[in-house]
Amino acid sequence: MSKKIKLLDCDVVYLSYDEPNKEKNYADLLTKVPWAKRVDGVHGSDSAHKACARLAETERVTIIDGDNIIKPELMNQVIELAEHADPNICVFSFPANNVINGLIYGNGSIKNWPTQLVLDMRTHENADPSNDKTQVDFCWEIKYIQMKNWMSWVYNNASPRQAWRAGFREGVKMCLMEGVKPTLTAPFDKQINWKNYHRLVAWMNVGSDVDNGLWAMYGARLGCYMTMLTNWDHTNVRTFSFLNDLFDDVKPNNDTILIKEINRLGENLRDQLGILTGPGYMDPDQSRFFKAVYTNPSRLGNDWIIESV
């Protein structure tokens, strides 16, 4: 492989499942990348990514999730690697801007993969049961290189279920340290990455200014609560059919009950884990203010990259 990687030279595959806005987002992608291919409705994150890799005809493949709207400059990105870097094992992650809470990080990010690596990896539903790092995410086992410039917006609030599921998944995953659940014998916020702790707090409190933002907060609080304060098996977060059934079981019937549940969970998380939440959340004006002034932490530097443009 070349040490200089141009995204224009890589196949692009749009990966969708059941997102309410997937057709709208795909139509937008085709105005910017008319040659983009598509995988739709494959169960399991590992299996779905392998379907994308099998569709690719290039050594690397760029995979774009179904809730993304890309920035046009994505396709102009060129990444130059250092001499010692091995392009066969590294994944480039371009952060995404989440419209619910303004967070910019790897959730929903566009990723450029070595095609063979995707075919060979075993994660999520295909993970080795003894490997905690691969049960619910890719990032703890694979050589992820975090790119500095964000390249898409994540619109995961097109329905109550989509927003709740997005919040719930992050409420679970932001609790983990390289896939491992913290103990209750030490302060919760000292056991996980500080950036993830800040993101978790934002998921729980910011977003009432957008459609279905309350559902994302409810999901984040419930995901954290079930992971840390019950005996629930957190690896079930990788199974979308499970999450859809869970949503049907726990969804409040009206906004009054929804807000009551958000407040109840927040109080429990504050009292039992010391998380910076509680009854209440940022109102629409406060949420807009947060998104206007909050500075997302810089992504980690990496000596494998000389420059990227």
Question: Residue spans of the language-model regions?
Answer:
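N-terminal anchoring/stem segment of glycosyltransferases
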Residues: 1-54
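A general structural motif
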Residues: 7-9, 58, 86-89
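Glycine/Thr-rich phosphate-binding loops of Rossmann-like dinucleotide-binding domains
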Residues: 22, 71-72
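Short alpha-helix within the catalytic core of nucleotide-sugar-dependent glycosyltransferases
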Residues: 50, 58, 72-84
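Generic structural signal for bulky hydrophobic/aromatic residues embedded
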Residues: 55-57, 121
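Short aromatic/hydrophobic "clamp" motif used to bind/position activated sugar donors
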Residues: 61
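The conserved acidic donor/metal-binding loop of glycosyltransferases
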Residues: 65-69
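Catalytic-site signature of metal-activated, phosphate-bearing donor transferases
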Residues: 79-309
